[in-house]
């Protein structure tokens, strides 16, 4: 596969694009992350999500430590060509490093952020003590 399709993406000045990751079954948004061209290429080639970690400044294969990989069903590019959507099968049901199904587990109620989603698996069981 030629890489010309990568040039259609409007990468930011720092060479990144935001990625919304959605569960293929529930349609819930699981997480938002970032990709550089190499992460997108690897995702397309392997069928599993790869992202760019801005804090660690390195490629990150989702599930490399936890086993909770994301099997990619679709890769979509938005109308402005500057945001990606990954539709995935979330292996193990846990997408968030907090041990929850998705990262959007805090909901604004009145003037407080309330935790609305349970922990599915204790992060220490997933990653060990850090």
UniProtKB/Swiss-Prot annotation:
Cofactor note: Binds 1 Mg(2+) ion per subunit.
Signal peptide as annotated in the record: none
GO CC terms: cytoplasm
Subcellular location, record wording: Cytoplasm
Job of this protein: Catalyzes the hydrolysis of the adenine ring of phosphoribosyl-AMP.
Annotated PANTHER family: HISTIDINE BIOSYNTHESIS BIFUNCTIONAL PROTEIN (PTHR42945), HISTIDINE BIOSYNTHESIS BIFUNCTIONAL PROTEIN HIS7 (PTHR42945:SF1)
Name the UniProt record assigns to this protein: Phosphoribosyl-AMP cyclohydrolase
Organism: Nitrosospira multiformis (strain ATCC 25196 / NCIMB 11849 / C 71)
């Amino acid at each position: 596969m030629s890489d010309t399709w990568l040039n259609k993406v409007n990468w930011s000045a720092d060479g990144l694009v935001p990625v919304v990751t959605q569960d293929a079954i529930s349609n819930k948004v699981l997480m938002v992350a970032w990709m550089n061209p190499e992460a997108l290429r690897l995702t397309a080639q392997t069928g599993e999500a790869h992202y760019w970690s801005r804090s660690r400044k390195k490629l990150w294969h989702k599930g490399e430590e936890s086993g909770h990989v994301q099997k990619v069903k679709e890769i979509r590019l938005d109308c402005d060509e500057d945001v990606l959507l990954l539709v995935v099968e979330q292996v193990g049901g846990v997408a968030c490093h907090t041990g929850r199904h998705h990262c959007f587990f805090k909901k604004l109620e009145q003037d407080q952020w309330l935790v609305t989603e349970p922990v599915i698996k204790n992060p220490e069981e997933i990653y060990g003590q850090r």
